[in-house]
Amino acid sequence: QMCIRDSRYSDDYTSAYYYPDLSSSIKNATLAITAVENQLEAATTTAHEKEFFPNVKQFARIWRAYLISEFVDNFGPYPIESFLGENPVFNSEKDDYEFILKELKEAAAAINTSVLPVEAEGKCDPFDNVKYDPVKWQKYANSLRMRLAMRLSNIDKATAQAEFEDAAKGNKILTADDMFAVKENDGWDVFSGVYTRSFDDQVLSSTVANLLTNLGGIKVTEQRSDLASYVKPANYLGIKYDRHYVANTDNPTKQYWLDGMPENLDPRALKIFCLPDDENAENYIDKYNDRTAKDFVLYTVDENGNPIPNKDNPGEIKIDATRCWNGYPAGSRGGWSPTLAYNQLVTNGYGPGCTLPMLGKDYCKGKSRIFFAAWETYFLLAEASLYGWNTGTTAKEAYENGIKASFEYFGVSEYVNDYLNSTNYNRVGTSVKFDHTTEPVSYTHLT
């Protein structure tokens, strides 16, 4: 996960995704398919509509195939004959995937790419950068088919390979212009941005903090020279607070607080996340104007977790989180762990949002959200090439093109060549260079 909605545990989102979200969306997509068939028989249908509406049917089939894949992957068997006026029978997941892949193949082939929508029709596309462009929808169908075929690679490799190779022959999402993005609005309508709620901090997780640190070997000061005074040596882990953070986690940086910035960061990191109180950053947002990164403390406790000198008047360890790079420790909540009870950085309602990096302005106040990106297609091609499948490219070429596409999107292409040749390991032992296969060794960080 890239970030987490800190300190809150609920299955309400999962329940709502099952019903009404997915169920209603599949129903509406099915209705669109049948409505086209009825509309084509209407006497009022124009010559243009008789050409355009069949494409709409294919767009709806593609969209429904995606929705059904979401249902199957999240909840299990799905009834293929749903929303057709009769009580359906649930199909097996194998049958569901066969249906999904067949729908995508047939729909992509049936799109008439010479038929373009008029302006009013294009505005109806929820992917506002696509506007019912038939070629782009065809590319989405093929890239989506590649994604879903790859999911079968561990259970039905023959089917996965056949479906993938066939889809890879067609048009695919490979450029920034091809990518699908959903428009986002402020407010409370169906297009409200998923990260726009002021009560959602969307802070950096410890997992992603470890992944991005040192990956690519690009110095933070190359991007932001004004952060030089906050940068710590690459082998410095931070200050250990083993009385304030839990130990029962596999996080390699558990119980450490980095009082500054790591020397090297993936150059996309500071485009995605903004640092606490980093008002110089282009993507900075201040959700809590009356609080700062210096307003939260750790209360002093003894080796048994008892406050010092007493519960009513514990001492304080002042923390200045200004422009510091730390991730929220997954599984943390003060009510579940007495270790965290005296840690305001975690348990105070405003603590995480003020002391940890969070998704920046482009996410919280953006106008669109990427739904299917070019780099995913490239990484799918890279994985398939490693399996020896026919892809028309090599694993290395596709892998590097995927990274280049991502760097282009985030506006950091000037770093991509050095990044691609980096053999630096991040905190979980991963390096960027494709040909760098030397396994990392354990070493001790300075603290």
Task: Give short role names for the model-derived ranges.
Residues R5-L380, A384-N401, A405:
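Structured, solvent-exposed acidic/aromatic patches
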